[in-house]
């Protein structure tokens, strides 16, 4: 290809991305789950799962979808034991292994203990709480010597992927605390750049859980030998009503267990072996059910979580945001490791998906969130599967467009009502007082339109005044400040249509800024905020974006 053509293509691509608008999402509100579009979508999802199960030769499968605080789709496919034709049908209350999805519970425990002051900071060296842990490093830089909670939870610790034990010894005395710590003390970190490169580590998460347990013992808030398991069980499982979720592979779980299968070399299927995870439980040892996982997802999505500060297990909104925050961008450019989720940008729907997979022999699960729309998905295949996302991405392609359509429709109805109510209110400061041309001595300009400014009709959007800042034509409007009754001279400026703007402009420009109008008394020309006598006041100046501009 001619070099000039290459440059032209690059320039066009750059230009298009420069002006690409920022995707916006409707506010998640209650919608009719019996709407024909939703019923059709749920039927499509059902057909999708059955079609893919058939093509992938999967006998048993579980799918649960939640929206805000309710289950909107939930179905079990196949038998409890697919190899037994007389087996009972699989249910949403049968136990399965969720494997590495356990890491979400361990992460939640870490944030909660930080919030409670049990651990001082996520950037503390874990050896301050667990001095028994030792590992060697070939790096002499003192900055690389410590391993922190944050590094363990974000796969940036430099630890190897797996615990230094044979898998068949998990849960036995051949792979207990003493044995593992002894082996690690003779091994080395594998990463040249801890805290920069991501290297997935089951060992790191198992160690994280054990250190969290030790921190509870150190602060004398717990005496139990298995402090990690005890805390998660009593503070998360019991608080959320996850009655069939446990670390214990006891008789109750065995009797309720859905049978996972693995394919042998000859193509036939065999029952997957199950053994306790033991020391490795924080990285993948939980047994749960679809219904219990729905409760967990609802907890992470529901607005009620932020409102019930008196509940037995409460998360601050800032902590919940940390749980869903990105940490380290991967080399593909659109996937990011977080704590504990892998965040991937779905280009077809212009939305981020936060997901955590769990894979053990015979059990392959995925828990994923489309958080802007408060949708949660838990899908589990009880045999090997060719889909890393366990069919969730295809399900999102069906569901997200429908939810956006219906939520936008509901939002439009609500907006019409709000606009009507706004028109019925008599503002403390009429729009005509604010409209006009503002300028400072450096030539900066701020123009506010109303229906009388230039005689060309009503220049308002949904009752809000239009704004032109420095001749930018940036479709800004003036909105009522939330505390308008107490501070009527304060207003908010924002874009009346955010879909027309780029993400960087929305984040770094005038959007959502507060502006402050200054009034003077007509009689004595002194500043005044006595709005009981509004007819005797006039606007003198406005403070906006760090500028003081005077009304001309």
Curated annotation (Swiss-Prot):
SUPFAM superfamilies: beta-lactamase/transpeptidase-like. InterPro entries: Beta-lactam-related, Beta-lactam/transpept-like, Beta-lactamase-like_AB/R. One of its GO terms (cellular component) is extracellular region. The keyword Endoplasmic reticulum does not apply. It holds the Pfam family Beta-lactamase. The keyword Protein biosynthesis does not apply. It is found in: Secreted. Glycans are attached at residues 57, 89, 244, 266, 393, 450, 475. Residues 1-24 form the signal peptide. Keywords: Glycoprotein, Secreted, Signal. Belongs to the beta-lactamase family. This is Beta-lactamase-like protein 3. It comes from Dictyostelium discoideum.
């Amino acid at each position: 290809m001619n070099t000039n053509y290459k440059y032209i293509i690059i320039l066009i691509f750059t230009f298009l991305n420069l002006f690409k608008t920022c995707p916006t999402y409707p506010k998640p509100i209650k919608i009719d789950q019996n709407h024909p579009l939703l019923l059709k979508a749920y039927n499509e999802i059902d057909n999708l799962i059955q079609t893919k199960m058939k093509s992938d030769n999967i006998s048993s499968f579980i799918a649960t979808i939640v929206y805000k605080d309710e289950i909107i789709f939930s179905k079990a496919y196949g038998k409890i034991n697919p190899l037994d034709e007389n087996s009972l049908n699989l249910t949403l209350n049968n136990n399965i292994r969720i494997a590495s999805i356990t890491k979400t519970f361990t992460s939640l425990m870490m944030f909660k203990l930080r919030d409670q002051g049990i651990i001082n900071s996520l950037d503390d060296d874990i050896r301050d709480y667990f001095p028994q842990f030792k590992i060697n490093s070939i790096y002499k830089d003192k900055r690389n010597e410590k391993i922190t909670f944050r590094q363990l939870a974000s796969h940036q610790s430099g630890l190897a992927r797996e615990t230094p034990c044979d898998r068949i010894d998990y849960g036995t005395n051949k792979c207990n605390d003493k044995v593992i710590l002894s082996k690690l003390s003779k091994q080395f970190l594998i990463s040249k750049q801890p805290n920069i490169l991501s290297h997935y580590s089951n060992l790191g998460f198992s160690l994280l859980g054990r250190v969290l347990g030790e921190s509870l013992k150190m602060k004398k808030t717990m005496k139990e030998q298995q402090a990690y398991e005890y805390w998660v069980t009593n503070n998360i499982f019991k608080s959320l009503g996850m009655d069939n979720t446990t670390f214990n592979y006891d008789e109750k779980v065995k009797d309720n267990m859905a049978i996972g299968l693995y394919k042998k070399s000859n193509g036939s299927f065999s029952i997957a072996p199950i053994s306790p995870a033991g020391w490795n439980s924080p990285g993948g040892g939980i047994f749960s059910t679809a219904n219990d996982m729905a409760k967990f997802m609802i907890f992470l999505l529901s607005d009620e979580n932020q409102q019930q500060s008196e509940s037995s297990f409460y998360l601050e909104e800032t902590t919940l945001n940390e749980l869903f925050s990105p940490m380290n961008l991967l080399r593909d450019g659109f996937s990011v490791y977080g704590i504990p989720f892998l965040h991937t940008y779905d280009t077809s729907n212009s939305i981020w998906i936060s997901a955590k997979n769990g894979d053990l022999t015979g059990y392959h699960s995925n828990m994923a969130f489309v958080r802007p729309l408060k949708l949660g998905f838990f899908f589990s295949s009880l045999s090997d599967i060719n889909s890393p996302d366990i069919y969730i991405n295809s399900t999102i392609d069906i569901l997200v467009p429908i939810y956006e359509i219906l939520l936008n429709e509901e939002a439009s109805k609500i907006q019409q009502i709000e606009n009507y109510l706004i028109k019925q209110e008599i503002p403390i400061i009429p729009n005509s007082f604010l409209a006009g041309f503002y300028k400072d001595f450096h030539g900066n300009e701020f123009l506010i339109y109303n229906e009388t400014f230039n005689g060309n009709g009503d220049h308002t959007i949904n009752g809000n005044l239009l704004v032109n800042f420095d001749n930018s034509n940036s479709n800004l409007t003036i909105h009522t400040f939330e505390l308008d009754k107490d501070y009527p001279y304060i207003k908010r400026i924002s874009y009346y249509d955010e879909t027309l703007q780029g993400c960087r402009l929305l984040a770094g420009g005038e959007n959502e800024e507060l502006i402050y109008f200054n009034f003077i008394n007509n009689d004595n020309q002194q500043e005044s905020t006595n709005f009981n006598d509004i007819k005797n006041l006039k606007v003198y100046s406005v403070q906006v974006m760090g500028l003081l501009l005077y009304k001309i």
